[in-house]
Amino acid sequence: MRCLTMPTLLRALAQAAHTGPPGGRTLHSSAVAATYKYVNMQESKTDMKSVTDRAARTLLWTELFRGLGMTLSYLFREPATINYPFEKGPLSPRFRGEHALRRYPSGEERCIACKLCEAVCPAQAITIEAEPRADGSRRTTRYDIDMTKCIYCGFCQEACPVDAIVEGPNFEFSTETHEELLYNKEKLLNNGDKWEAEIAANIQADYLYR
């Protein structure tokens, strides 16, 4: 019995499905069958050149060396990544990072305890307590932000009428404990003092679009 190759067997099955049993109806019309595309039915060529080429690709690993050549070519191209944390990419002036409370150049706190940021915060992450001063102005006695609740939407910064609470450019403030992410007024003011130059520059750069 002659052993049939897979492509030959597939062609025989397709022919049988097309012609059908003697005296019976065909399974497929010739017009439809003519449009069929059979996958992997092409037999490999057996001439000397084709056989030699296949043997060379198999024995000499040409595909492997072609892949290695592609990999080595990228060693001489400009890298698409940066060496973080020693190199850092640019940040938008609208970047929303770690929170900070700002002061006026005189050193006076900007916050007027209007509590708009506390009211607008969708995560209810801000807690403010305030009392009036002798001159009638209001200032905060407590300004807490639970950074584990914050979703960095920027609503607090948008709602503030005096640019007191802002989200600065710092994004490297990971901690080892939960308690370190519960910011109080002192922590927020220290952040503002530390990043004031960058914060002021970002606000100025975005001034026309606010």
Curated annotation (Swiss-Prot):
Keyword hit for Mitochondrion: yes
GO biological process, one term: mitochondrial electron transport, NADH to ubiquinone
Cofactor: [4Fe-4S] cluster
InterPro entries, A to Z: 4Fe4S_Fe-S-bd, 4Fe4S_Fe_S_CS, NADH_quinone_OxRdtase_chainI
Ranges where the 4Fe-4S ferredoxin-type domain occurs: 102-131, 141-170
Pfam families (alphabetical): Fer4_7
Cellular component GO terms, alphabetical: mitochondrial inner membrane; mitochondrion; respiratory chain complex I
PROSITE patterns the UniProt entry points to: 4FE4S_FER_1, 4FE4S_FER_2
Keywords: 4Fe-4S, Electron transport, Iron, Iron-sulfur, Membrane, Metal-binding, Mitochondrion, Mitochondrion inner membrane, NAD, Oxidoreductase, Repeat, Respiratory chain, Transit peptide, Translocase, Transport, Ubiquinone
Record: transit peptide: 1-34
Residues the record lists as binding [4Fe-4S] cluster 2: 121, 150, 153, 156
Keyword Glycoprotein: no
Subcellular compartments: Mitochondrion inner membrane
EC number: 7.1.1.2
Subunit structure: Core subunit of respiratory chain NADH dehydrogenase (Complex I) which is composed of 45 different subunits. This is a component of the iron-sulfur (IP) fragment of the enzyme. Interacts with RAB5IF.
Alphabetized PANTHER family for the sequence: NADH DEHYDROGENASE [UBIQUINONE] IRON-SULFUR PROTEIN 8, MITOCHONDRIAL, NADH DEHYDROGENASE UBIQUINONE IRON-SULFUR PROTEIN 8, MITOCHONDRIAL
Protein's recorded name: NADH dehydrogenase [ubiquinone] iron-sulfur protein 8, mitochondrial
Organism, scientific name: Macaca fascicularis
Gene: NDUFS8
